Amino acid sequence: MVNLVIVSHSAMLGEGVEMLARQMLTGDNCRIAVAAGIDDPDHPIGTDPIKVMEAIEAVADTDHVLVMMDMGSALLSAETALDLLDPVIAEKVRLCAAPLVEGTLAATVSAAAGADIDTVIDVAMNALAAKQAQLGITPPAHAASLPAQAPDSDARSVTVTIRNHHGLHVRPASRLVAALAGMNADLVLEKQGQCVKPDSLNQIALLQVRCHDAVTLSASGPDAERALAAFESLAAEDFGEHPESMALKTSASTVEKVQGKAVFYPLPLAQPARHPCSDVGQEERRLQQAIVDTLNDLNALAALAEKKYGASVAAIFSGHYTLLDDPDLFDAACKVIRNDSCCAESAWYQVLMELSQQYQHLDDAYLQARFIDIEDILYRSLCHLKGRDIRLPTPDVPAIIVADDIFPSAVVNLNAQLVKGICLREGSTLSHAAIIAQQAGIAFICQQGAVLDIIQPEDRLLIDPAAQRVSCA
């Protein structure tokens, strides 16, 4: 006798498939258990290995248990459950790669008829045949196992190590697919010699990317640089799975209306003058030293962030370090210095502002918001090049910072006892500045536009985070 376990990211989906499958039964010769969703009312979509283990145990009084899964972390949770189970029970369990709905229905019918486990699996794996025949579709032989072609020899590539606990499962993989969608580039995602096109969740799933795996994105074509930048940034952000990706989800309920004196903070980044240089080597050395100094700053900022707000905020500046510690950026700036015989400040500004523009033109709002991080790094490194101090807002009375936008490094340095709120003409609630402000308990509103034109220095302001509104108190 074969019993079934249905594993899905969604409790509603899992229960719905179970309901359909039970319509196939006329007796109790195939029992079905469900392990779907997670016990978090705010974020119910996901899979839980403990639930899977308990579901298997509930129907383990049989010869075999067949586990049907949707995709991504459902497979990982099922595999983890096998490790947690009593070995005697684990020996009975088989994981099935068939499509969840059609495969479960077919497996239920076969199991209820008394078929052995191998037959049940075979029937489930061929469950799409009827639908394909009805639609006149001839399935390509071995389509799912065919890898993409290896990247062209002239393609550029970026390799990252996956830090997501469950690897590239549905949610992080979907963010990758969305970020790369529509780019005019030939893209190949590779892990240990296996190559797929990163435009399909299913293809990415075929790579079975686990935590600590190294994966490489290769790109050629007009949008190759944009694609690689998006991939590298997403990886630095753990593909949106980091707790910081929730941004201001609860900020409206945790920060009340606040008042303070208006303190203007003009974004300190300005385009440097383009001076000619007579010693190219000297300019390259100046730039290299400024980058080293900035990397040291970012390490210090990460330490400060961890001390004040924990590891999730510290990871922001560790990500900045990764973005800056890229020899391609330095090489690109050196090329500008040599070709244009210009100073390091001008060349560095050109290269990083081009990168900032690439981020701003991405379709993914989460990635778009990262352009200000690039400009934060640029400002800090220009200060080192020019021998200038970093300019930060330091009010001495309860204040509301008023600015066009604000750097994450400025927010992490704010005295949250005195800075009651941040009010931006532009900005984004998905920005790292917003995330840090929320951790600090500082009210944050953005996209205020022309409303800020009527505010004068020393005005007393009232910020309502829930309404995303500012007014004179």
UniProtKB/Swiss-Prot annotation:
UniProt entry keywords in alphabetical sequence: Transferase
Keyword Transferase recorded: yes
GO molecular function list: phosphoenolpyruvate-glycerone phosphotransferase activity
Region of interest called PTS EI-like, N-terminal part, as start-end residue ranges on this chain: 266-472
PROSITE patterns in the cross-refs: PTS_EIIA_TYPE_4, PTS_HPR_DOM, PTS_HPR_HIS
EC numbers: 2.7.1.121
SUPFAM superfamilies: Enzyme I of the PEP:sugar phosphotransferase system HPr-binding (sub)domain (SSF47831), HPr-like (SSF55594), Phosphohistidine domain (SSF52009), PTS system fructose IIA component-like (SSF53062)
Top-rank taxon, per record: Bacteria
Residues annotated as domain HPr: 155-242
Active site: H9 (tele-phosphohistidine intermediate), H169 (pros-phosphohistidine intermediate), H432 (tele-phosphohistidine intermediate)
Domain PTS EIIA type-4 positions: 1-137
Gene Ontology cellular-component annotations: membrane
NCBIfam families, sorted: dha_pts, PRK11377.1, PTS_HPr_family
Family of this protein: Belongs to the PEP-utilizing enzyme family.
Name assigned to this protein: PEP-dependent dihydroxyacetone kinase, phosphoryl donor subunit DhaM
Organism field: Pantoea ananatis (strain LMG 20103)
Origin organism lineage: Bacteria, Pseudomonadati, Pseudomonadota, Gammaproteobacteria, Enterobacterales
